[in-house]
Design a protein with these regions (language model features):
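Intrinsically disordered, low-complexity regions enriched in Ser/Pro/Gly/Gln/His and often acidic
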Residues: 5-7, 18, 146
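Bacterial N-terminal signal peptides
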Residues: 13-25
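N-terminal secretory signal peptides that target proteins for export/translocation
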Residues: 1-11
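Formylglycine-dependent sulfatase
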Residues: 27-175
């Protein structure tokens, strides 16, 4: 009999708690939408302070890494920029995207594919591209949209940067 009374008390308590949650406004317990900062770089390996490299000083990236996600087993899908980035942004392997060269635009091969940034947009996020995500010709296309995918962004910014403004230094073998 005591066990039955305990079960009834627990059931009554759970009912009150459940009623409280059902009566609460729908959004009041929703998790706050996280900010997402996605950085993608050409030719960047794990020679960074945040990965324990003793010589490389990368304090800004290290601070971001402390609060974010560091990948320890992430591998490039292809030895060229265009196919690798298309793979990363779609979640498909290069043989699935059929983008095996740099001069191929994503929508030429995959007109209906959903990019990672489009998925964020569908969830109510702003997806802003600053600089290069998909391939573009260097140095000719620096500061332009290049082979970008306009469907993937709510806004774009195309900075020229030092690789364009100091082009002679970039392509020089002298320090």
């Amino acid at each position: 009999m005591a066990a039955r009374i305990a079960v009834l008390k627990i059931s009554r308590w759970l009912s009150v708690v459940l009623l409280f949650f059902l009566a609460a406004p729908a959004g009041s317990f929703a998790a706050e939408k996280m900010n997402v900062l996605f950085l993608i770089c050409d030719d960047l390996n794990c020679d960074l302070g945040s990965y324990g490299h003793p010589q490389v000083k990368s304090p800004n990236i290290d601070r971001l890494a402390e609060r974010g996600v560091r990948f320890s087993r992430a591998y490039c899908q292809y030895p060229l920029c265009g196919p690798s980035r298309a793979s990363f942004m779609t979640g498909l392997y290069p043989d699935q995207t059929t983008i095996l060269g740099n001069a191929i635009r994503l929508r030429e091969r995959l007109p209906g594919v959903q990019s990672m940034s489009q998925m964020f947009i569908r969830k109510g996020y702003e997806a802003i591209r600053i600089g290069k995500i998909y391939h573009y010709g260097v140095p000719r296309d620096i500061g332009t949209d290049g082979h970008d995918d306009p469907k993937s962004w709510t806004r774009t910014v195309n900075p020229k940067g030092r690789d364009k403004t100091d082009e002679s230094k970039v392509f020089s073998l002298r320090p």
